[in-house]
Regions:
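Adenine nucleotide-associated cytosolic modules
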Residues: 2-7, 11-368
């Protein structure tokens, strides 16, 4: 039966459905334009670029100061599918620099809180939260679907794992980090640019690298680093990434920006020899819950000698430390845990039986 519209116009049912669908498309287009209008008029983005973002998937590994800011920017830019992976919970010390969280989020999983806030910020996108430790057993399954991966981690072990996954599966990713008043960013395109291990062949010995917990961090630098990293991720998604390999270093206190050329290592074990040792189960850290002791032992897979006296000097500013030439004992006055660290990197974390909590403590105070 024909439908009679205003002004006496007749329309068949099939034509009516077409009109409804057309009207829906117009409304949807208006909605998208209203949300993304400032990006759509950019010659670097435009309608084709915005469509590409909406059909893209990005995973953010780590939801600390850098990762949460990158996630926020990607969601508001309209990346269609986001996945955030983080094993930790929101702590009071996070609020100084992790702008996605507030006091009402304390003790909640970071990935869960972040995903809920991003859904409220942009209901047009899909956001997945994975409250897990990224490790060699799950990394390929978790990261394998992404078009781009953004680094928001706090330790080199996980970064080397991400580098292995991305190189093996040819997934572009953006390495970044911030500590003190400076940060660095390097976009990595498998088969095009050097990989992370061309730049850093091996994980530095435990206790050598600075961490935010030991060196501090000015809350402005993670936001700047995340903005640069997110821009690099968007360029990759749009096929407009730079083809020359570069490491971007920014010091927010001195207001200096450097770009360093990174050269591919012709003997790189990862991107040249295809040795993905951080995906090798035989080479992963050994983590053991100690029976009857309310403690977890962590034995690093890679041998190294920790400078206990130097690390003790750093830890002394934030807790109680005792050390000799063989061991270091550290007590955090704000928590119940106690860490005994040995020269070879082995540690016993007392006050928890949770392997993930122990790994988090180890990564925080014994930088890797």
């Amino acid at each position: 039966m024909d439908l009679i519209l205003a002004f006496g116009t007749k329309m068949a049912p099939n034509d009516c459905h077409k009109l409804v669908n057309a009207n829906f498309s117009v409304v949807s287009a208006r909605h998208e334009y209203a949300r993304y209008s400032r990006q759509l008029i950019l010659p670097e983005i435009g309608t084709e670029g915005q469509s590409a973002l909406q059909n893209s998937s990005v995973s953010v590994v780590g939801c600390g100061a850098t990762g949460s800011t990158a996630l926020n920017l990607l969601a508001r830019a309209g990346v269609g599918e986001l996945t955030v992976i983080d094993r930790d919970f929101v702590e009071l010390t996070n609020l100084q620099r992790q702008v996605l969280f507030d006091e009402g989020d304390l003790d909640l999983p970071k990935a869960l809180v972040a995903s809920e806030k991003m859904r409220r910020a942009n209901s047009d996108i899909v956001v997945h939260d994975i409250i897990k430790d990224l490790n060699l057993n799950n990394a390929e399954d978790i990261l394998g679907h992404a078009d781009v991966i953004v680094d928001g981690t706090d330790n080199m072990e996980t970064r080397f794992l991400v580098n292995d996954v991305c190189t093996k599966h040819e997934i572009p990713w953006v390495y970044c980090g911030a500590v003190g008043t400076h940060g660095m960013v390097m976009p990595i395109i498998p088969r095009t640019t050097p990989c992370l291990r061309c730049f850093i062949p091996n994980i530095p010995p435990q206790g050598v690298l600075q961490t935010c917990d030991l060196a501090g961090v000015l809350n402005t630098i993670p936001t700047i680093v995340a903005s640069i990293a997110t821009t690099e991720a968007i360029r990759i998604l749009l096929g407009k990434q730079a083809t020359d390999a570069k490491l971007i270093i920014y010091d927010v206190w001195e207001q200096t920006l450097q770009k360093m050329a990174v050269v591919k290592d012709p003997s790189c074990r990862c991107c040249v020899e295809s040795e993905f040792e951080f995906l090798d189960a035989k080479k992963g850290d050994k983590i053991t819950t100690l029976c009857g002791r309310d403690a977890v032992q962590i034995t690093p897979a890679r041998e190294g000698t920790i400078k206990l006296a130097e690390l003790a000097g750093n830890l002394d500013r934030i807790g109680q430390v005792k050390h000799n030439e063989y061991t270091l004992l550290f007590k955090d006055p704000h928590t119940d845990f106690e860490m005994t660290l040995f020269r070879d990197g082995r540690a016993i974390i007392k006050g928890t039986r949770d392997p993930e909590a122990a790994k988090s403590i180890y990564a925080r105070y014994v930088a890797r």
